[in-house]
Curated annotation (Swiss-Prot):
Biological or metabolic pathway of the protein: Cofactor biosynthesis; biotin biosynthesis; biotin from 7,8-diaminononanoate: step 2/2
Binding site residues for [2Fe-2S] cluster: 103, 134, 194, 266
GO molecular function, one term: 2 iron, 2 sulfur cluster binding
Binding site for [4Fe-4S] cluster: 59, 63, 66
Designated name of the protein: Biotin synthase
Recorded name of the encoding gene: bioB
Native organism: Pseudomonas entomophila (strain L48)
């Protein structure tokens, strides 16, 4: 691969091009992905995050993969929004074991007005500890997005899950365009985007390629791209889906790395089902971020000490916390606020 090819970041990928990447011989694909990875990252550093469920279960969405959906009987005990102090205690614990980013997830269709003040206090408190902050709260409106940005939220997670064509087979309570709109609000507010998808839901190769195309062809690539392997939970409609071929999963990571060379590609849900050899291949394919700890929201994750033992055997070290230019972040927020105020001054006759 030429130096000029490595330096080019694209936003115009076609389905034919991406499928051709998937269909390369395995070794060729991994070589291309690893070459791209080394052009932008230290191949022996992996970003480490901890994920905490701050509100569990009884979600009104009908995502067929999710044990938190109120539509399915999975035996999951629902819990109300966690107290702010408890969240901060968990964040301190995460920092103590080596995490540099603390992600907070709530099983909501969207956050309510009464819950937003508590959510904002969580962001401010975790940020004050010196951790990067990330949240996944469902769909956001512009006002909520700006409030999160002003509180200091670094990343917002909102996955696209799959291709637009397959999406309706998995979720009916939220549209694909609504997901894209939330991502646009997040970007306009000056925050960073975490967005990816899930393998193993019965999707085709075209759907896997289509998901990556949606992400890679955004105006700016997501800074973080979580690639999840379906965790099959009894009671959900996808509990009996066939397992993903491990090599197909590695191919997905490799193609994500090639399409979005500057993004962190996260080895996310399903890592509990992966042996050490598969995880090592994932890092070779360009994965450079993991969730660290015992749970991913409601499903098991490899224990923290096992992760560090594997890192030691592979010569991998946790990535240091990314330092943000606060003045740049603040400038983006201020610009977004100005644009919102300006838009409120104009009456749209077409909407009447």
């Amino acid at each position: 691969m030429s130096a000029s090819a490595i330096a080019t970041t694209r936003h115009d990928w076609s389905l034919a091009e991406v499928k051709a990447l998937f269909q390369q011989p395995f070794n060729d694909l991994l070589f291309q992905a690893q070459t791209m990875h080394r052009a932008y990252f230290d191949p022996n550093r992996v970003q480490v995050s901890t994920l905490l469920s701050i509100k569990t279960g009884a979600c009104p969405e009908d995502c067929k993969y999710c044990p938190q959906s109120g539509h399915y009987n999975t035996g999951l005990e629902k819990q109300k929004l966690m107290e702010v102090q408890k969240v901060l205690e968990e964040a301190a614990r995460a920092k103590a074991i080596g995490s540099t980013r603390f992600c907070m997830g709530a099983a909501w269709k969207h956050p309510s007005a009464k819950d937003m003040p508590y959510v904002l206090e969580m962001v401010k408190g975790v940020k004050a500890m010196g951790l990067e902050t990330c949240m996944t709260l469902g769909k956001l409106d512009q006002e909520q997005t700006l409030a999160l940005a002003q509180a200091g939220l670094d990343y917002y997670n909102h996955n696209l899950d799959t291709s637009p064509e397959f999406y309706g087979s998995i979720i009916t309570t939220r549209t694909y365009s609504e997901r894209l709109q939330t991502l646009a609000y997040v970007r306009d507010a000056g925050m960073k985007i975490c967005s990816g998808g899930i393998l193993g839901m019965g999707e085709s190769l075209d759907d896997r390629a289509g998901l990556l195309i949606q992400l890679a062809n955004l105006p700016e690539h997501p800074e973080s791209v979580p690639i999840n392997m379906l965790v099959k939970v009894a009671g959900t409609p996808l509990a009996e889906e066939e397992d993903v071929d491990p090599f197909d999963f590695i191919r997905m990571l490799a193609v994500a790395r090639i399409l979005m060379p500057k993004s962190h590609v996260r080895l996310s849900a399903g890592r509990e089902q992966m042996n050490e050899q598969m995880q090592a291949l994932a890092f070779m394919a360009g994965a450079n971020s993991i969730f660290y700890g015992e749970k991913l929201l409601t499903t098991a994750n490899p224990q923290a000490d096992k992760d560090m033992q594997l890192f030691a055997r592979l010569g991998i070290k946790p990535e240091a916390r990314e330092e943000h230019a606060d003045e740049v972040h603040q400038a983006a927020i201020e610009q977004a606020l100005v644009e919102q105020r300006n838009s409120e001054l104009f009456y749209d006759a077409a909407s009447a």
